[in-house]
Amino acid sequence: MKRKLSLAEAVEAARILFEMNAGEQGVLALAGRASLPHDTEEERTRLLTEWRAFAHASVMYALMACAPNVVVVEYLRATQGMLRGLGCSADEGEEFVDGAFSAYADPLVRLQAQECPAVFFRRLLGWEVSEVPAQNAAVVSGVMAMVLSAVMDKLEQYDYALE
């Protein structure tokens, strides 16, 4: 039997899933495995922004598939607070939503998740996937697929009791 979540619990569960999949330590470990630039502060910031945008879009997509629309709306409303918790200013939050997040949300809502690695490499490195060493592209693509699948699996475990 599925556990029933209230609106507040559903948004909190989504927020936790975002945090679990967007943590700095995990993203930097991925960068090391995939030979992504992350030595300078600027490189780390760009990498974290791109990965967090993908993670946020993944949670939004899974909510769209599993939960009532009101949960999606409330999760998206919580975005600025989540970004402030990561040290982003209001302006940086707006840039994140309008730029990086939108870049990943677009293929996901079109049911074209396979485009996300191309978006990632294009935005982070200015390269097409074909220009990225195959092993590095496979690592990033595989982790993206696992994140999306894990978030979807987790959110499918709940019923949403919003009355």
Predicted feature descriptions by range:
Residues Q25-P68:
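N-terminal interaction modules that seed assembly of large macromolecular complexes
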Residues S6, R44-L48, G93, A113:
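Helix-start/N-cap signature of alpha-helical segments
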Residues M60-E74, C88-E92:
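Short, solvent-exposed secondary-structure capping/transition elements
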Residues M1-E41:
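N-terminal leader/targeting peptides and immediately adjacent processing regions
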Residues M144-D159:
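Long, hydrophobic alpha-helical segments that serve as membrane-spanning/inserting helices
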Residues E50-W51, V72, V119-F121:
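Short, compositionally biased low-complexity segments
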Residues A10-V27, L76-M146, E163:
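Polybasic, proline/glycine-rich intrinsically disordered low-complexity segments
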